[in-house]
Structures are given as C-alpha cells and as structure tokens.
C-alpha cells in the first residue's frame, strides 16, 4: 500500500505541477521476487531469518488509471551470486546461453521476465567486483569477488548479453567507479577505526571494487 501511495503521489505531483507524465516504478530485489524457490525453505523457526523467500512484492498486482498513460514498469537489482537459489535451482543453472554455456543468470532473468509478462522489466543493478576477497561463491563462476579486472570485464559482458537475450527493457551496470566507503562482512571487523574506512581503498573488500573505473 505504501509503495502504491508513493507512486500515486509522484504521478499526481508531476502531472499537476509540470503537465508531464513519465513511467514510474520502485526498486525490488531477488528476496522479494514473486516466484517460489524451494531451495530457500527453512522449517526451523530459529533460523528462519535466512529464508529469502518468505515475502514477495509482485509488480503485476499494481494497477494504474487509464489517465496515467506511461504506466508502471518492473525494476530489480539482480546479481548472479545471491540469494543461493539463483545458482542452485536446476532450472536456472541448466539454462544454456547463446555461447552454449550454462548460465544461471540468464535462466533467472527469463523466469523473472515471464513472471512480469506485459510489464517492461529493467535490471536496475547488476555487476561483479574485481576485489581480491570473495564474499559469496557461485557454482558457475559469477562470484562476489576474487576476480581480476579482465575477469570482471569478461563476466560482466556475459551478464549484459543475458539482459539483452532475455528481452529485458535494459540494464544499469553497477558501477562506474569504486566506492571506498562501502563495508562488507568479510573485512569489516578489521577496518578500524570504522569511520576512516572511506579514506582508503581496500582491495580485499568486494563492496569497494565494483567499479569499472578505479579512483586511486
């Protein structure tokens, strides 16, 4: 309800103030996608917080007035290594891309696209870091870190091609430059004092090394 009200407010404001209308959306991510993922089911209540399939937000449930011509589009941050179901579910990991290789990212995108049929799907974030540290492994090599810059470019080109092949509306690559202020569980306990983290570039930290342009 809150998300619908915020989009409604934005559309009304733009229409009445500027006499213009643009498509609207909000950013969603994989743990809130509308599909059921059996690899995420955890029956033990004590560790239920690790179940990334408990709640869903479905773009197809939102409806707009005929007076709002541009309409709503679906927007997701999608990374090929998290949550685990994106590379563990058989239908994703067995998907073959146009190079003849198994490609779990493409498999997930096709599933997400079909679940949002009739709605443009924008991949609002995707990418891989070129850090020394690796904070999340993927069975098909799309790790969250542990890549050289050359490997980062290679895998990123595969992800970009996948977005096109799955007929998405487009993709926003994450990201242009490295972000020195980011923290990551892999190294955060060793970055002391924490408030000085932004003053130096930590090559062990995956979150600081998504950029395709180094700032050093």
Label each residue range with its predicted role.
Residues 28-30, 125-128, 172-180:
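Short, solvent-exposed turn/loop segments enriched in Gly/Ser/Thr/Pro and often Arg
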Residues 1-9, 13-14, 28-40:
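Active-site cleft segment of glycoside hydrolase catalytic domains centered on the general acid/base Glu
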Residues 1, 40-60, 187-208:
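Charged, glycine/proline-rich intrinsically disordered loops and linkers
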Residues 133, 137-141, 162-169, 173-216:
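Aromatic-rich peripheral "rim/lid" segments of glycoside hydrolase catalytic domains that contact
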Residues 18, 24, 39-40, 44-141:
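Glycoside hydrolase catalytic-domain groove-lining segments
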Residues 3-11, 106-110, 156, 160:
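Generic structural signal for well-ordered alpha-helices
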Residues 11-16, 164-168:
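Sec-exported extracytoplasmic/periplasmic mature domains
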């Amino acid at each position: 309800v809150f998300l619908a009200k915020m989009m409604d407010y934005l559309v009304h404001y733009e229409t009445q103030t500027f006499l213009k209308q643009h498509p609207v959306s909000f950013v969603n991510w994989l743990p809130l996608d509308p599909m059921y993922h059996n690899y995420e089911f955890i029956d033990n209540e004590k560790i239920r917080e690790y179940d990334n399939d408990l709640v869903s937000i479905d773009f197809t449930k939102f409806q707009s007035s005929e007076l709002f011509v541009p309409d709503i589009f679906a927007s997701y941050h999608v990374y090929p290594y998290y949550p685990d179901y994106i590379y563990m579910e058989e239908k994703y990991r067995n998907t073959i891309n146009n190079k003849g290789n198994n490609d779990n990212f493409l498999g997930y995108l096709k599933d997400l696209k079909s679940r949002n049929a009739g709605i443009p799907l924008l991949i609002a974030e995707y990418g891989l870091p070129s850090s020394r540290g690796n904070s999340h492994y993927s069975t098909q090599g799309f790790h969250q870190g542990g890549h050289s810059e050359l490997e980062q470019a290679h895998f990123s080109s595969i992800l970009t091609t996948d977005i096109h092949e799955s007929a998405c509306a487009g993709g926003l690559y994450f990201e242009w430059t490295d972000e020195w202020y980011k923290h990551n569980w892999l190294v955060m306990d060793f970055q002391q004092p924490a408030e000085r983290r932004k003053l130096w570039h930590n090559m062990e930290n995956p979150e600081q090394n998504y950029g395709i342009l180094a700032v050093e």
